[in-house]
From Swiss-Prot:
Keyword Cytoplasm: yes
Pfam families, alphabetized: 120_Rick_ant
Protein name according to UniProt: Antigenic heat-stable 120 kDa protein
InterPro entries in alphabetical order: Rickettsia_antigen_120kDa
Organism expressing this protein natively: Rickettsia japonica (strain ATCC VR-1363 / YH)
Lineage: Bacteria, Pseudomonadati, Pseudomonadota, Alphaproteobacteria, Rickettsiales
Keywords associated with the record: Cytoplasm
Primary location: cytoplasm
Gene symbol of the encoding locus: sca4
Annotated Basic and acidic residues bias: 19-34, 1009-1018
Domain of life: Bacteria
One Gene Ontology cellular component annotation held by this UniProt entry: cytoplasm
Polar residues composition bias: residue spans: 1-11, 69-80, 355-380, 387-402, 996-1007
């Protein structure tokens, strides 16, 4: 190995010992310098990767064809994205490869063999255009290898790959309107480590499919050889933990991760190639790994399971986010699920990879997955510096085969390589033996039937302590040893879980207080203990384990900063665990509370942990809310009106909740999306959406500000826009949303928010335009309705004519009458406290201020009166109401038997009650006066009115007295109390005074004008 840590290939690489002229050496050195100096960043950098998900079984039918690379028959249509990858990338590559093979066969000197192979290709192509049998036949290996040596073909295959992935990603992107389509990965950094990122993948129903974890590996530089012989240094790459089994939610998933350049950065978009895992919906609805698509040919930088995959593309080296071990796992799962085989860049690419030895065993689709990983051609094996708790792995560099190699040099290099491998195996065996001994000791302790729980705990603690304090072990080996103890505790079937939690706490305490471990190594042990604690069977044991571990952190001799880091590590482990949101919420809340109380968390750490807790809480709330909404929507016994009312109640609870406006918006977006995607009729869904919108618009401004209402309304529209409903239904629901805003008297800011929701939705531009037109049409219709209602309300009204009894005129008079007392009071003030000039200015300002306030109040009243819900009515309506009210008052007056009761009635109902209009009160007085005059006419026949005569003449009663027959008849007509002449005089006086008082109200409200009236002539 060279001093700088790179592999010294001259010892092991036969080609490195080839003699070059001085000119050739200078040329090679210059090419290497030029390559290493290429640091210009592309203008358009490729995305990290893309994710596409679906919860619809209609979009994904599991393929049942064998692991052969065949495209499924029409009757077995596979996932459309998987099919598109085959048709736009894999099949065109195969077609070009076959074309080159046929050209090579035509130039073959053995014409019989050439004709035989040509017929074999043509006959199979008629049956199976993928030619899987041809590519799987070992006898065809040399023809495939030779074709791939053609540089023009290599360029074609690379261009097909780049263009194909770009086309697939664009066609099936969410931005293009494909439901649940490809969208860039949104990674979130772990708080505890900057080299760890994660993202939660959900199906289009919002259910979690899996959590992807990405690790950026900073490694000691190692070299990889390109096909032209130049070498490239690799010091950074990433690994993604692609899931093997998915059992959380239904649907399909495609993970397409961009290959990184040799320096660990992303390539430009025009050079981007991807490693894609296709998970199609299985028979049970859960995603199954059915196929892997990757660039060709796929190689690995070593023989160990942790060796990273890489490719050479366009003359450059790119690393893929998958290791040899992970690739083997994935291929085994593909075979298990009987999915489509990998394309040219997998099983078949491995067969035809350039530079492979002819003696290597052929990898066919029917072989086991472990053999489907291409072994490297030349292994340069030296003991690299790696953590001693992991087996040491040789670094591998694949070199081109096209040059002639000296057999003696090759044999010498191979022998030396074998010796180095033996040395590595010996070192690894020693380390493995130490860890195995620790495991055996832990197992023996826990299985000792003679020991009780306390003794077992003491012995486990002693074992962990001895491991940490063993000076013969490296720090990494100590970590591996303690973790082996923890793993043994986890797997033990005899120890109760609560007792296991105590062992975890004690083991963590030993590690944290050790002076032989660095903080990073202590954290590794703590994280392993948390993993074991979270794997316990019941929630009480899990809670006890986490509580004990955090107690150990607080009691340790770590610095406050390191304690905070440990708490964050515990929180991160809880956050990414497979536990339910409810349990995560409880555990994370407990960790946060304890960290705050112990004052080990910085404000930034508290905020980050609180954000994670809020996300979990919001997710749980969202899940519970959507379940309630679905229960309402699918209730067969409730009609649309009842469904709307019940969902409105849920909306109100969400708006009143403690969550942020953003979280409330997310929940309501899920609700509208659920409603829009339901199986109800379009008009029923629109009615429910209208109710939701009205509830948001009318919600109290004190608990929900106007900007937050607008934010939530935009989210509501986004839920509609991104739903699976067809476009006409979404247009109708958008109109319903706007109608609800107008019904709820929402302002223009809320209406504009609907457009914002459309703009921010993940749909194509034509759909956005259609929804905006629907929104504008609904707004115009609502304004037309308001205008029409105002017009109807003003029919028959002449607002400009100032009649004494007109409502508008009276409102203006009220303003004047209210201002007059203010002016009079100021004029009477004779105690100036300032100079005359200042007093005039102050008084004038005060008067104007009062006038302004009163004017604003009255104008608002005037506006309210003119609104569709105001009190402005037509003359006919007002007349009918007045007559009805007058009759009610006269009837009520008639129930009063004594003069005192009648006078009290007049004062209370006709003078003091200002809620009645002047017109009604005056008409009532006029009618009562007429009644009194009829009674008077009975006593004085000379003033008897025609009305009374007519009424009296219709009476069929006989006179009681011959002297005064009319009196008796009149008693029957007007009632016995109304013939009391003295009482009549008092009542008539009271009525006339009341009339004068009412008429003078506009002139002086506080002082009614009394009028002296003499009794009428008798």
């Amino acid at each position: 190995m060279s001093k700088d840590g790179n592999l010294n290939t001259s010892e092991f690489d036969p080609l490195a010992n080839k003699e070059y002229t001085e000119e050739q050496k200078q040329t090679l050195e210059q090419e290497q310098k030029e390559f290493l100096s290429q640091t210009t960043t592309p203008e358009l950098e490729a995305d990290d990767g893309f994710i596409v998900t679906s919860a619809s079984s209609a979009q994904s039918t599991p393929s049942t064809s064998a692991l052969s690379g065949n495209i499924s028959p029409d009757s077995q249509t596979s996932d459309p994205i998987t099919k598109a990858v085959r048709e736009t990338i894999i099949q065109p590559q195969k077609d070009n490869l076959i074309e080159q093979i046929l050209k090579d066969l035509a130039a073959l000197t053995d014409h019989d063999l050439a004709e035989q192979k040509r017929k074999e290709i043509e006959e199979e192509k008629d049956k199976d255009k993928t030619l899987s049998t041809f590519f799987g036949n070992p006898a065809n290996r040399e023809f495939i290898d030779k074709a791939l040596e053609n540089p023009e073909l290599k360029k074609k295959l690379e261009s097909i790959e780049i263009a194909g992935y770009k086309n697939v990603h664009n066609t099936f992107s969410a931005a293009s309107g494909y439901p649940g389509g490809f969208k860039p990965v949104q990674w979130e950094n772990h708080v505890s480590a900057s080299d760890l990122r994660a993202t939660v993948v959900k199906n289009d129903a919002g259910d979690e499919l899996c959590t992807l974890n990405e690790t950026t590996v900073k490694t000691k530089p190692f070299t990889l050889a390109k096909q032209d012989g130049t070498q490239v240094q690799i010091s950074s790459y990433r690994e993604i933990d692609f899931p093997i089994k998915l059992d959380k939610a239904d649907g399909s998933m495609h993970l397409s991760m961009v290959a990184l350049k040799a320096d660990g950065t992303k390539p430009s978009k025009d050079k981007a190639v991807y490693f894609t895992a296709h998970y199609e919906e299985g028979p049970n609805g859960k995603p199954q790994l059915k196929e892997i698509s990757s660039p060709k040919p796929l190689k690995f930088a070593g023989t160990g399971d942790d060796a990273i995959a890489y490719i050479e593309h366009g003359g450059e080296i790119y690393t893929l986010a998958v290791t040899r071990g992970k690739y083997k796992e994935m291929m085994k799962e593909v075979e298990l699920n009987q999915g489509q085989s990998v394309d040219l860049s997998q099983a078949e690419d491995i067969i035809i990879g350039q530079g492979q030895s002819k003696e290597q065993p052929l990898i066919t689709p029917q072989q086991t997955t472990s053999s489907s990983v291409e072994p490297p051609q030349y292994k340069q094996q030296v003991p690299p510096i790696t953590p001693t708790n992991q087996p040491l792995q040789p670094e591998t560099s694949q070199m081109p085969q096209s040059q002639q190699v000296n057999p003696n040099l090759l044999n010498a290099a191979t022998a030396l390589s074998g010796s180095m491998q033996d040395l590595l195996n010996y070192v690894n065996a020693g380390l493995t033996k130490e860890i195995d001994l620790i495991k055996e000791a832990a197992t023996a302790i826990l299985n000792d039937k003679k020991s009780d729980i306390a003794e077992k705990q003491a012995n486990i603690i002693a074992l962990a302590e001895n491991t940490v304090n063993n000076k013969n072990l490296t720090p990494d080996a100590k970590v591996a040893g303690v973790n082996a103890v923890l793993e043994t505790i986890k797997n033990d079937q005899n120890t109760p879980d609560l007792e296991k939690s105590k062992m975890l706490e004690a083991t963590v305490a030993i590690a944290l207080n050790s002076e032989n471990l660095e903080p990073k190594q202590k954290q590794q042990i703590l994280e392993k203990a948390v993993d074991v604690g979270l794997s316990l069977k019941d929630d009480a044991s899990r809670a006890a384990a986490i509580d004990g571990i955090t107690d150990a952190v607080i009691k340790s001799n770590l610095s406050t900063e390191d304690k905070g880091t440990m708490f964050i590590a515990v929180g991160d482990k809880v956050n990414v665990s497979e536990l339910s949101n409810a349990e995560k919420q409880k555990l994370l809340g407990s960790v946060l509370k304890k960290g705050v109380e112990a004052q080990v968390l910085s404000p930034a750490q508290q905020q980050l942990m609180q954000q994670n807790l809020d996300k979990i809480t919001a997710e749980q709330t969202k899940k519970d809310t959507i379940k309630k909404v679905n229960d309402i929507l699918f209730d067969p016994l409730s009609n649309t009106e009842l469904k709307t009312t019940n969902i409105q109640a849920i909306i109100s609870n969400v708006l009143d909740g403690p969550a942020t406006a953003e979280v409330k918006g997310e929940i309501i977006q899920e609700i509208t999306n659920t409603v829009a995607g339901s199986s109800l009729e379009a008009h029923d869904k629109a009615a429910i959406i209208k109710g939701i919108s009205e509830t948001i618009a009318t919600h109290s401004d004190t608990s929900l500000s106007l900007p937050n209402k607008a934010l939530i309304m935009a989210s509501a529209e986004k839920g509609i826009a991104e739903s699976q409903a067809n476009l006409p239904d979404r247009e109708l629901m958008t109109k319903g949303l706007v109608d609800g805003i107008y019904e709820g008297k929402g302002g223009p800011e809320i209406t504009k928010a609907v457009s914002s929701g459309i703009d921010n939705s993940n749909i194509n531009d034509s759909e956005k335009e259609a929804l905006k037109k629907a929104k504008d049409a609904a707004s115009e219709a609502a304004l037309d309705r308001e205008t029409q209602n105002l017009t109807e309300g003003l029919k028959g009204q002449n607002i400009e004519e100032h009649k004494p009894h007109d409502d508008i005129y009276n409102k203006v008079r009220e303003v004047i009458n209210a201002v007059n007392p203010v002016i009079e009071a100021l004029e009477k003030s004779k105690e100036p406290v300032v100079s005359a000039e200042e007093r005039i200015v102050q008084e004038t300002s005060s008067i104007l201020n009062n006038i302004s306030k009163l004017a604003v109040e009255k104008v608002n009243n005037f506006r309210a009166m003119l609104s569709p819900n105001g009190n402005l009515k037509t003359l006919e309506e007002k007349k009918e109401e007045s007559i009805k009210k007058v009759d009610e008052l006269v009837k009520a007056f008639g129930t009063k038997s004594s003069t005192e009761e009648q006078q009290s009635f007049i004062k209370a109902n006709l003078i003091d009650d200002k809620t009645l209009s002047k017109e009604i009160r005056l008409q009532t007085i006029d009618k009562l006066l007429q009644e009194q005059k009829r009674a008077e006419a009975i006593e004085n026949p000379s003033v008897k009115t025609e009305d009374v005569r007519v009424v009296s003449g219709k009476s069929k009663l006989k006179p009681i007295s011959k002297d005064k027959p009319d009196i008796e008849k009149a008693k029957m007509v007007v009632g016995r109390d109304r013939v009391n002449i003295k009482g009549n005089i008092k009542i008539m006086r009271a009525l006339m005074n009341a009339r004068d008082s009412i008429q003078s109200e506009n002139l002086n409200k506080s002082t009614p004008i009394k009028r002296e009236s003499s009794p009428p002539q008798r």
